[in-house]
Regions:
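N-terminal beta-loop-helix "entrance" segment that forms/cooperates
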Residues: 1-9, 107-108
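Helix-loop-strand module that forms the ligand-binding subsite of alpha/beta enzymes
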Residues: 7-92, 98
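Glycine-rich phosphate/pyrophosphate-binding loop and the adjoining helix
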Residues: 92-171
Length: 171
Protein backbone atom coordinates (compact mmCIF):
# COMPACT_ATOMS: atom_id res chain seq x y z
CA UNK A 1 0.00 0.00 0.00
CA UNK A 2 2.98 2.34 0.40
CA UNK A 3 2.88 3.07 -3.33
CA UNK A 4 -0.83 2.97 -4.01
CA UNK A 5 -3.01 4.00 -1.10
CA UNK A 6 -2.83 7.72 -1.83
CA UNK A 7 -1.08 7.56 -5.20
CA UNK A 8 2.24 8.77 -3.84
CA UNK A 9 5.00 6.18 -3.61
CA UNK A 10 7.67 6.10 -0.94
CA UNK A 11 10.22 5.02 -3.56
CA UNK A 12 12.16 8.03 -4.80
CA UNK A 13 12.71 7.03 -8.41
CA UNK A 14 11.96 8.06 -11.99
CA UNK A 15 8.70 6.13 -12.26
CA UNK A 16 6.37 9.16 -11.81
CA UNK A 17 8.11 10.98 -14.67
CA UNK A 18 8.06 7.83 -16.78
CA UNK A 19 4.36 7.32 -16.05
CA UNK A 20 3.62 10.85 -17.24
CA UNK A 21 5.56 10.21 -20.44
CA UNK A 22 3.70 6.95 -21.06
CA UNK A 23 0.38 8.66 -20.38
CA UNK A 24 1.21 11.24 -23.04
CA UNK A 25 1.82 8.58 -25.72
CA UNK A 26 -0.61 7.10 -28.19
CA UNK A 27 0.82 3.58 -27.92
CA UNK A 28 3.01 1.42 -25.71
CA UNK A 29 5.66 -1.04 -26.88
CA UNK A 30 7.05 -3.35 -24.22
CA UNK A 31 10.26 -5.16 -25.05
CA UNK A 32 12.63 -7.39 -23.16
CA UNK A 33 15.50 -9.75 -23.74
CA UNK A 34 14.75 -13.28 -22.60
CA UNK A 35 16.65 -14.60 -19.58
CA UNK A 36 15.93 -18.18 -18.50
CA UNK A 37 12.67 -18.12 -20.47
CA UNK A 38 11.48 -14.94 -18.76
CA UNK A 39 11.67 -11.15 -18.91
CA UNK A 40 14.73 -9.34 -17.61
CA UNK A 41 14.97 -8.49 -13.92
CA UNK A 42 14.85 -4.79 -14.73
CA UNK A 43 11.60 -5.24 -16.64
CA UNK A 44 10.10 -7.19 -13.74
CA UNK A 45 11.02 -4.41 -11.30
CA UNK A 46 9.43 -1.87 -13.66
CA UNK A 47 6.27 -3.97 -13.92
CA UNK A 48 6.09 -4.28 -10.13
CA UNK A 49 6.14 -0.49 -9.92
CA UNK A 50 3.16 -0.37 -12.30
CA UNK A 51 0.83 -1.89 -9.71
CA UNK A 52 -0.91 1.44 -9.16
CA UNK A 53 -1.36 1.98 -12.90
CA UNK A 54 -2.77 -1.54 -13.16
CA UNK A 55 -5.22 -1.14 -10.27
CA UNK A 56 -6.52 2.16 -11.59
CA UNK A 57 -6.30 1.24 -15.31
CA UNK A 58 -4.34 4.41 -16.02
CA UNK A 59 -3.48 3.44 -19.60
CA UNK A 60 -6.92 2.20 -20.66
CA UNK A 61 -7.76 3.19 -24.20
CA UNK A 62 -4.22 2.85 -25.48
CA UNK A 63 -2.89 0.26 -27.90
CA UNK A 64 0.33 -1.67 -27.56
CA UNK A 65 2.50 -4.55 -28.69
CA UNK A 66 5.37 -6.67 -27.41
CA UNK A 67 8.87 -7.49 -28.61
CA UNK A 68 11.30 -10.10 -27.27
CA UNK A 69 14.79 -11.16 -28.24
CA UNK A 70 16.33 -14.45 -27.25
CA UNK A 71 19.24 -16.69 -28.08
CA UNK A 72 17.05 -19.74 -28.54
CA UNK A 73 14.03 -20.25 -26.31
CA UNK A 74 11.30 -18.49 -24.39
CA UNK A 75 10.65 -15.65 -26.81
CA UNK A 76 7.04 -16.49 -27.58
CA UNK A 77 6.28 -16.96 -23.88
CA UNK A 78 7.84 -13.59 -23.05
CA UNK A 79 5.83 -11.89 -25.81
CA UNK A 80 2.67 -13.47 -24.37
CA UNK A 81 3.59 -12.26 -20.87
CA UNK A 82 4.36 -8.72 -22.05
CA UNK A 83 0.99 -8.60 -23.82
CA UNK A 84 -0.64 -9.96 -20.65
CA UNK A 85 0.83 -7.03 -18.68
CA UNK A 86 -0.43 -4.62 -21.34
CA UNK A 87 -3.92 -6.06 -20.85
CA UNK A 88 -3.55 -5.68 -17.08
CA UNK A 89 -2.86 -2.00 -17.72
CA UNK A 90 -6.06 -1.70 -19.77
CA UNK A 91 -4.14 -1.64 -23.07
CA UNK A 92 -5.32 -3.54 -26.15
CA UNK A 93 -2.40 -5.35 -27.76
CA UNK A 94 -2.14 -5.69 -31.53
CA UNK A 95 0.38 -8.53 -31.25
CA UNK A 96 4.05 -9.14 -30.81
CA UNK A 97 7.24 -10.48 -32.27
CA UNK A 98 9.99 -12.68 -30.92
CA UNK A 99 13.41 -12.92 -32.56
CA UNK A 100 15.71 -15.86 -31.78
CA UNK A 101 19.25 -14.86 -32.72
CA UNK A 102 21.27 -17.74 -31.26
CA UNK A 103 22.47 -19.75 -34.24
CA UNK A 104 21.22 -17.51 -37.01
CA UNK A 105 23.34 -14.46 -37.68
CA UNK A 106 20.71 -13.16 -40.10
CA UNK A 107 17.74 -13.50 -37.74
CA UNK A 108 17.50 -9.81 -36.93
CA UNK A 109 17.56 -8.80 -40.60
CA UNK A 110 15.12 -11.59 -41.47
CA UNK A 111 12.64 -10.35 -38.87
CA UNK A 112 12.66 -6.76 -40.10
CA UNK A 113 9.60 -7.15 -42.34
CA UNK A 114 7.58 -8.75 -39.52
CA UNK A 115 8.67 -5.98 -37.15
CA UNK A 116 7.66 -3.31 -39.66
CA UNK A 117 4.29 -5.02 -40.15
CA UNK A 118 3.75 -5.02 -36.37
CA UNK A 119 4.64 -1.33 -36.22
CA UNK A 120 2.21 -0.55 -39.04
CA UNK A 121 -0.50 -2.54 -37.30
CA UNK A 122 0.09 -0.58 -34.10
CA UNK A 123 0.05 2.75 -35.95
CA UNK A 124 -3.15 1.68 -37.71
CA UNK A 125 -4.77 0.82 -34.39
CA UNK A 126 -3.92 4.26 -33.04
CA UNK A 127 -5.20 5.93 -36.19
CA UNK A 128 -8.28 3.81 -36.94
CA UNK A 129 -8.98 1.84 -33.78
CA UNK A 130 -8.68 -1.87 -33.22
CA UNK A 131 -10.90 -4.32 -31.43
CA UNK A 132 -10.29 -7.84 -30.24
CA UNK A 133 -13.32 -9.40 -28.53
CA UNK A 134 -11.17 -11.82 -26.50
CA UNK A 135 -9.04 -8.97 -25.13
CA UNK A 136 -12.09 -6.80 -24.52
CA UNK A 137 -13.49 -9.58 -22.32
CA UNK A 138 -10.18 -9.78 -20.43
CA UNK A 139 -10.14 -6.00 -19.95
CA UNK A 140 -13.73 -6.06 -18.67
CA UNK A 141 -12.87 -8.85 -16.21
CA UNK A 142 -9.83 -6.88 -15.02
CA UNK A 143 -11.92 -3.75 -14.48
CA UNK A 144 -14.53 -5.74 -12.55
CA UNK A 145 -11.78 -7.07 -10.30
CA UNK A 146 -10.08 -3.70 -9.76
CA UNK A 147 -13.38 -1.85 -9.27
CA UNK A 148 -13.42 -2.85 -5.59
CA UNK A 149 -10.02 -1.20 -5.09
CA UNK A 150 -11.21 2.02 -6.72
CA UNK A 151 -14.41 2.06 -4.65
CA UNK A 152 -12.57 1.27 -1.43
CA UNK A 153 -10.13 4.15 -1.96
CA UNK A 154 -12.49 6.68 -3.54
CA UNK A 155 -12.05 9.17 -0.69
CA UNK A 156 -8.24 8.99 -0.94
CA UNK A 157 -8.06 8.76 -4.73
CA UNK A 158 -10.90 11.03 -5.83
CA UNK A 159 -9.33 11.80 -9.22
CA UNK A 160 -9.01 8.11 -10.07
CA UNK A 161 -12.52 7.41 -8.81
CA UNK A 162 -13.95 10.27 -10.89
CA UNK A 163 -12.13 9.00 -13.99
CA UNK A 164 -13.70 5.57 -13.51
CA UNK A 165 -17.14 7.19 -13.21
CA UNK A 166 -16.47 9.27 -16.34
CA UNK A 167 -15.39 6.12 -18.24
CA UNK A 168 -18.66 4.44 -17.21
CA UNK A 169 -16.89 1.70 -15.25
CA UNK A 170 -18.61 2.79 -12.03
CA UNK A 171 -22.25 3.79 -12.14
Amino acid sequence: DACSLNGICVNDDDVPALMARIQATDAIVFGSPVYIDNISGQMKVFFDRLADAIHYQQFAGKFGCAVATTAESGGDEVVAYLNHVLNYLGVVSVGGISVATGKNAGAVDASESAARALGKKLAGAVRDGYTDPAQEAILADNRAYFKSIVLENRDLRTESYERWVKMGWIT
